[in-house]
Amino acid sequence: MLRDEDRIFTNIYGLKDKSLRGAMARGHWDGTKQFLEKGRDWIINEVKASGLRGRGGAGFPTGLKWSFMPKESDGRPHYLVVNADESEPGTCKDRDIMRHDPHTLIEGCVIASFAMGAHAAYIYVRGEFIREREALQAAIDECYEYGLLGKNNKLGYDIDIYVHHGAGAYICGEETALLESLEGKKGQPRLKPPFPANMGLYGCPTTVNNVESIAVTPTILRRGAGWYTSFGRPNNHGTKLYSVSGHVNRPCTVEDAMSIPFHELIEKHCGGIRGGWDNLLAVIPGGSSVPCVPGAQMKDAIMDYDGLRELGSGLGTAAVIVMDKSTDIIKAIWRLSAFYKHESCGQCTPCREGTGWMMRVMERMVQGRAQKREIDMLFDVTKQVEGHTICALGDAAAWPIQGLIKHFRPEMEKRIDEYTRNATSHGAVLEAAE
């Protein structure tokens, strides 16, 4: 379990002073100018050495991503864009950073912008986050007044930070759709290549990072890459914010070390499973877009990228959704299908048509008003959507259903049998989805 002195986010619950003075008293903005004086290469190499992987879901090495930016300017400005469009069902970590600990993010923006030669950073905040945006803007205004941001500031590097409010579309959490939205266009993902590091915002070199990825970098530089790599297993280093919701006794967002066993995370921070461990049905370990894992497999699972991949799932945003045996698992996954159908931007045919198909067949599965062969047909549809779209929304819509079929097929067949038995006893004629 992580000790309090090792926590990066010291005010994640908003119990302390979140102003600039309070943040400085807790050690933020300490030595920032010295980091900038050490140069861009030192910062990028230190972040690489720390093994920090993107905290937005994909887990791409952050230092490597920063190094893709052109070293020399070709006349075009460089931009840093922070993805604060936190819309993944179950995820609520970034909003706590912006609402209660915004100076970790602002200091991170300054350091990351300097490392990539950017003089402007844009923070794209989810449309529904009203209070979070107000808190973040107030913190930015404080930094301007104190002389930490703007032209000729105390840090010796000109940097402006702008907050942009989204309009409520989940698809704008995809980095290229976010850039389109930021430019004032319809939020639809772009084809890659060209990648944002080459042609991003307004056609200029851009790096898009998650809020948590940016917010942890100042502490990594202050305490050293060696300190950060002391947490977690190889290739899964550092600390992580876990958002635990669902059927636990105390749902919470908590910072702990990577590679913590699932049962330890739940027992130490959440007061255990509602009704005890025998009552655990399934867990979605990384936000709604990763497959669910049965409770029996999940108890001893290691909460990191590799540990959950071995179970056929993923860490994603570390939004842990716990379901006990009172849950209708088929209906829960249908609800996710309905979400993805609603949020598909409609640009790619497999996703536009496939999400609707998956939702409608899942609706039949919830009622049991289906044939057993439709389970295989549903799986085939998910395979035709997965990997055939510009962005990962198609995969995100397909994976929860694949996880359901893989682990809970007997439950689906049982429901079909029950419905068929009741229907045929009343002389009804069953139809297949085809």
Curated annotation (Swiss-Prot):
InterPro entries: ComplexI_51kDa_subunit, NADH-UbQ_OxRdtase_51kDa_CS, NADH-UbQ_OxRdtase_suF, Nuo51_FMN-bd, Nuo51_FMN-bd_sf, Nuop51_4Fe4S-bd, Nuop51_4Fe4S-bd_sf, SLBB_dom. Keywords: 4Fe-4S, Flavoprotein, FMN, Iron, Iron-sulfur, Metal-binding, NAD, Quinone, Translocase, Ubiquinone. Coiled coil: none annotated. It holds the Pfam family SLBB_2. FMN binds at residues 166-213. It catalyses: a quinone + NADH + 5 H(+)(in) = a quinol + NAD(+) + 4 H(+)(out). NAD(+) binds at residues 54-63. SMART domains: NADH_4Fe-4S. GO terms for molecular function: 4 iron, 4 sulfur cluster binding; FMN binding; metal ion binding; NAD binding; NADH dehydrogenase (ubiquinone) activity; quinone binding. Its EC number is 7.1.1.-. PANTHER family: NADH DEHYDROGENASE [UBIQUINONE] FLAVOPROTEIN 1, MITOCHONDRIAL, NADH-UBIQUINONE OXIDOREDUCTASE FLAVOPROTEIN 1 NDUFV1. Belongs to the complex I 51 kDa subunit family. NCBIfam families: nuoF_fam, PRK13596.1. This is NADH-quinone oxidoreductase subunit F 1. The lineage of its organism: Bacteria, Pseudomonadati, Pseudomonadota, Alphaproteobacteria, Hyphomicrobiales.
